[in-house]
């Protein structure tokens, strides 16, 4: 029962972040990136452009047990940047019970979504050399894993609500991996998304000399978002800088 309550609250938190505007319908819905699982699908929002566009790929949260790609339709990152020439994708992936409880298998499967996009980059007018990833909670773990444990050409990473599985992820973080901007909006009472997990990630990056910006709320031990600034806007600036720089600089 407690676990169910947590999952429900996790969805509420996720919804609290993404409900900023009207629903933005995708250009393509339910594109199958793999035949392995029913949930191996993604939605794609393509910016109107004569030149190949950069792409931000989102992975939803939900403790690997719930959640759906459709939650991204109201995200302010999408709402504010699609018309500015940035394309977006939102990915579904198998739940943990569909991979027999094997977290590693689930994480590795998510790489198929990026491979599908890069393989079809010309078809969708995507610049495969300018792909960044973002994700909430469980999705935060996925983004860091794809960027650092896999060689997928990801340019930058935006994990939100870095969760308690972070210690298992840290050995995969590498000095030549993509830079990270992490944001935990929870305070000290949230044991699932405790600020210490974002701090752990930041510390590991510092040890490796990897660029990492970490933000949180007042009293969390993390730097707060500058007054008048939106963290999604800061993340987009971070993405754009990575797209202009040499790989993983």
List each model region and its residues.
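N-terminal cap/lid segment of alpha/beta-hydrolase-fold proteins
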Residues: 20-50
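C-terminal catalytic histidine-bearing segment of alpha/beta-hydrolase fold enzymes
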Residues: 43, 183-187, 195-202, 206-249
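Short beta-strand element of the alpha/beta-hydrolase
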Residues: 53-62
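Serine-hydrolase catalytic-loop signature spanning alpha/beta hydrolases and amidase-signature enzymes
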Residues: 63-66, 88, 116
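The feature captures the conserved acid-bearing segment of alpha/beta-hydrolase catalytic domains
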Residues: 156, 161-207
């Amino acid at each position: 029962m407690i676990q169910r309550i947590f999952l429900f609250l996790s969805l509420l938190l996720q919804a609290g972040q993404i409900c900023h505007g009207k629903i933005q319908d995708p250009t393509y819905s339910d594109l199958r990136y793999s035949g392995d699982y029913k949930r191996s699908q993604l939605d794609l929002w393509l910016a109107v452009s004569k030149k190949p566009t950069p792409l931000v790929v989102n992975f939803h949260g939900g403790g690997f047990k719930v959640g759906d790609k459709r939650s991204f339709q109201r995200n302010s990152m999408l709402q504010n940047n699609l018309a500015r020439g940035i394309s977006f994708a939102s990915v579904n992936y198998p739940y943990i019970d569909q991979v027999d409880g094997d977290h590693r298998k689930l994480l590795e499967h998510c790489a198929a979504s990026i491979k599908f996009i890069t393989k079809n980059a010309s078809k969708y007018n995507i610049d495969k050399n300018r792909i960044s990833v973002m994700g909430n909670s469980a999705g935060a773990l996925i983004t860091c894993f794809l960027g650092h444990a896999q060689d997928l050409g990801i340019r930058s990473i935006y994990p939100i609500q870095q969760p308690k599985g972070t210690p298992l992820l840290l050995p995969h973080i590498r000095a030549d991996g993509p830079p990270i901007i992490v944001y935990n909006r929870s305070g000290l009472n949230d044991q699932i998304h405790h600020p210490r997990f974002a701090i752990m990630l930041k510390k590991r990056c510092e040890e490796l000399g990897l660029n990492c910006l970490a933000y949180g709320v007042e009293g969390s031990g993390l730097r707060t978002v500058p007054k008048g600034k939106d963290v999604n806007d800061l993340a987009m600036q971070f993405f754009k800088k990575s797209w202009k720089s040499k790989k993983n600089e």
